[in-house]
């Protein structure tokens, strides 16, 4: 097999789109903590000195939206207007309504449950139509593709050296990107690393490049993967002072590839942040990852993509497919059988299995929803692997 070059990117928690994701999920967490059955579809947008929160929320709880916005901005590090927005002084606009009753009637009681109320897992219908995908690979311990894993780690390291004042001239906004050369379908070397980070205006460019390479890149990347041909692009425009919501308007749901698998598999188009778990865009995508990770952990294949489609108001998935990219150790039909016999992809079953009605979403709103070994996430567990091994 010829060598190929594959690339993934990530962004820091201070990227304007990620700021919006974190605000939306912080609001969701606050609501679901008080009212686990709340229906939340919370969107956020941001620009210079302004945050707007909008969407549809049905809940018995009360949360102070403005306080959550300011707290989230402050935790990220936006405490100075020069950075693009100041948590203490920014304007906040809210425009929130209840969930449409037309949608609610299909979610509260699915098509199947209306006909036969004997199965509790038929109760919830999917909150919308659409497709979701999950993916896992054995090329890293996290089950993520190496370019994405490294991009996330570099982005987190940027935030760490900023917050710990190792590089005290850094500002919150930043992006990372890694290109890996694959040989015979396995990572061989790193072709290129891109790091762009917001900074104070009086920083010497050459000093910044030296600092970022020493304190960020070489602290994360295995030097055995770097050779004399590896390219480093550090703030390649030469200047990144204007950033955050001042540099680019931010919007919830615009980093869906960063949130998932870095372009290594399909994506149904639905974002995660700000959505309660009755939305299959989120819950079923987490479940598809859970399945794929267990299938790979069981040794049924080296790579696995799992896809589901849903109809609004219907509990059972309309379709399910898998792709093992030619790495399957048994027939794919047998893997499908194993999935069907061990996993229930109806929304209520997913919510119960993964315990999704809890305030866990703010933590995954930056640096990826998957492969998070720093968190105890239910959809990252491989507790079905032993049961799946019997199909080998």
Curated annotation (Swiss-Prot):
Binds 2 divalent ions per subunit. Mg(2+) binds at residue 17. GO terms for cellular component: cytoplasm. Its EC number is 2.5.1.6. Transmembrane segments: none annotated. The keyword Transport does not apply. Its cofactor is Mg(2+); K(+). Residues 99-109 are annotated as: Flexible loop. GO terms for biological process: one-carbon metabolic process; S-adenosylmethionine biosynthetic process. Pathway: Amino-acid biosynthesis; S-adenosyl-L-methionine biosynthesis; S-adenosyl-L-methionine from L-methionine: step 1/1. CDD domains: S-AdoMet_synt. Its main location: cytoplasm. GO terms for molecular function: ATP binding; magnesium ion binding; methionine adenosyltransferase activity. K(+) binds at residue 43. L-methionine binds at residues 56, 99, 248, 279. It is an enzyme of class 2 (transferase). Homotetramer; dimer of dimers. Catalyzes the formation of S-adenosylmethionine (AdoMet) from methionine and ATP. The overall synthetic reaction is composed of two sequential steps, AdoMet formation and the subsequent tripolyphosphate hydrolysis which occurs prior to release of AdoMet from the enzyme. Belongs to the AdoMet synthase family. This is S-adenosylmethionine synthase. The gene is metK.
